[in-house]
């Protein structure tokens, strides 16, 4: 049966599917050492975007690489299914808004809609992953909404509760009034924005002192109605000052930063003198007994503000702790909806966070506003809905993460981070400021918090499993009960302390606890798969966006540290953001979003993958555009494909079967290409093993272009020659080795084209092969160094041709090469044939003396010699101008510039020296050598140049007519004058470049094609 060749991405995907290549790639490594990979779960109720591409590319690259390196790498997909984003999507779909509407709609109905919503785009995610070439098991994923998963999460929470680590507390927490739920510290860290808010310096009148005021600066005027105290620092100095007819008290060091008018200092004293002084609040609230006086607060500083802080315990953690310590009254004037309640009748019903202007107007009306101004600061916003958060005192459920702070930090220090600065930077800094994890959410669609509280004695119980729930339930519970609201809400347990009824708390848990539990819950641990869990914990590698230092990276680390004493991952790669071409964040509203599926359809997945990997390190933010993908396709993917097509084109003619074991060739180019290949393997392996995929990709890119531009170009004649000579066999064997090895080397990066090349050449899937290891015996560093020099000389010469406007098709009679004194070019004659072919040069002269070909221009560097010579500078320049050519050369070559002046010691740096070619030569030079090309064109050279250019044009016609290169043809040319002579003189050159029966000159009247050459028309027909 004839082997079917793979050509398109769809054909390759179909081949992988029908031949189960993904499964085979894993099964082939069974019994080998495992490399454990965790796939961070996306949510399937939104479409994949450009940021998802980078994450999936890196994960796939690592998994494929480690598999080819011999590891057993299982790849289990996951779905993150709970949380507020799902609720908001459902609200929008069914036309409701807010918690009250949800309650009216019915929690059960709402939960059912959420379950449907989470897999709205599962097909798009599957197609996207398949099209990208992302190999992951999506047929048996872990799903956070499934009972087995939730049961494992419950088991973790139950363990924490039994150890006293899960507790109910009253704390000031970040709170979203739009979503009406608290946020954890790591969620808050994801949503900071730079904003300008109104700040105010407020006057607090001292009791029994009509004209004396404390001045307090606040950036949250909307919290003033909740004021219960003023805080000072007893160790700071404060002053009483007079401004016109009023007296103000504030920190001495801050007077000049606050007071703009003329003032007089009346008295200066310690802050301790102010403690217990009473004041009249700007918005007094009835019913408070222990409030409205000055207290000491260690957190008060003289770095900004007035040194006096207004205390609102409902809206600040420091404020709340101070109130607890001093037994002050607590005042809350804001509802959970974020509006003022009737404790603040002036603005009852107004959105508090939006009321700064109204508050300032009220202060002004009461003559209690000293001044107001805009204040720019970093303010937390909800990472889900974008609304500004408030700090709000409320009851909540917390995990005592601070008890494990040192262990968590130590475990983080043992993680290998990419980039390394994340460890002590973004991640380390966040861990240093860790607070207890606020885990409860007053929402609906999530893992229910598994805590039941006795209605009679307040005893708490946290069941660890469904069986535990059944054993303690008052009513019978079905085996298949769904562990979601409202079903678990209806379960009552029997209190083990007093036999009373226990009811579940209303909260669901933070979705980050869901995803952070995946190392355990994906295996239904500890109920099942304990051995499998032990084999898959911890992960060797994870990768997600940099934001996940406050999300998944954090939750994984914290949960596993508390539960198992160690991190759940050994290595973490933190991915940068994908930005638009102007460095702006992509968003639908800006219209700058790139659709990855469209890019894949247009340019292929490999182009997109390679563009993301080779552009810059994956942890860098990337400016990205369609143009970058298009250029990548052109510069790398197409180049690699064209090398394969070149090999395939000639091999279809010769039907040569290359040796499986490559041996040393007799050809210098072959040995150089194979040496470079093995050096590439050696160096790129070092990079990929250190997760530096970008550096590896750049090396591969450079090598591929070198093979295309040099090896293919210089070996074309070897493949073209008739028959199968030993030299031709060497060329085939070498290029076959390059293609099959290179395809294995790039397979983790670009899985489609690597499969096409390797399978079509060998009949075997590249993804079932081992990753290449270098062969020391093939590395010849001296040969590589010599060819590197040859390439530099050729490139320098090409630049000279370009500067002289001499096309490469035009042969030149001679080039002269002069190395500098440090460069040894004694080896160069061995490469003359290569240089001649590359540059279309007849003769090469290697010399240490080019005096016959150049002149020197010598001028003073006036900025250097001016200070040395003063008014004698002009005399020295006159002397230089009078020197003969011979004297100039002698002076420069001897470096004896001191002889020019007895007044100052002159050196080479005091002169501007230019090397100029004589009229008939073109010069090009670098630090290593000087190149001179003879521009004189004899009639014979001109005719040969015309013939070569005409051959190029005929080759284009042949390709246009889709004539195979081995198709025997008759060439009919209608031409006169000098061009006719060019063809006649160089007829053999045509026979060397085409398989022709004959060349016929001016023998027919009508021709198929007309081409223009040197402003003349040439008629051509190709017949076969």
Swiss-Prot record:
GO cellular component, one term: cytoplasm
Subcellular location: Cytoplasm
Cofactor(s) the protein requires to work: Zn(2+)
Pfam families: Anticodon_1 (PF08264), DUF5915 (PF19302), tRNA-synt_1 (PF00133)
Top-tier EC class: ligase
Primary location class: cytoplasm
GO biological process, one term: isoleucyl-tRNA aminoacylation
Reactions listed under catalytic activity: tRNA(Ile) + L-isoleucine + ATP = L-isoleucyl-tRNA(Ile) + AMP + diphosphate
Residue positions binding ATP: 588
Lineage: superkingdom: Bacteria
GO molecular function, one term: isoleucine-tRNA ligase activity
Keywords tagged on the record: Aminoacyl-tRNA synthetase, Antibiotic resistance, ATP-binding, Cytoplasm, Ligase, Metal-binding, Nucleotide-binding, Plasmid, Protein biosynthesis, Zinc
The UniProt record lists the keyword ATP-binding: yes
Gene3D superfamilies cross-referenced by the UniProt entry: HUPs (3.40.50.620), Isoleucyl-tRNA Synthetase, Domain 1 (1.10.730.10)
Extent of motif 'KMSKS' region: 585-589
E.C. designation(s): 6.1.1.5
Keyword field contains rRNA-binding: no
Motif ('HIGH' region): 42-52
Function field: Catalyzes the attachment of isoleucine to tRNA(Ile). As IleRS can inadvertently accommodate and process structurally similar amino acids such as valine, to avoid such errors it has two additional distinct tRNA(Ile)-dependent editing activities. One activity is designated as 'pretransfer' editing and involves the hydrolysis of activated Val-AMP. The other activity is designated 'posttransfer' editing and involves deacylation of mischarged Val-tRNA(Ile).
Matching NCBIfam families: ileS (TIGR00392), MupA (NF000257)
Record's subunit section: Monomer.
Swiss-Prot/TrEMBL domain comment: IleRS has two distinct active sites: one for aminoacylation and one for editing. The misactivated valine is translocated from the active site to the editing site, which sterically excludes the correctly activated isoleucine. The single editing site contains two valyl binding pockets, one specific for each substrate (Val-AMP or Val-tRNA(Ile)).
Family: Belongs to the class-I aminoacyl-tRNA synthetase family. IleS type 2 subfamily.
The name this protein goes by in its record: Isoleucine--tRNA ligase
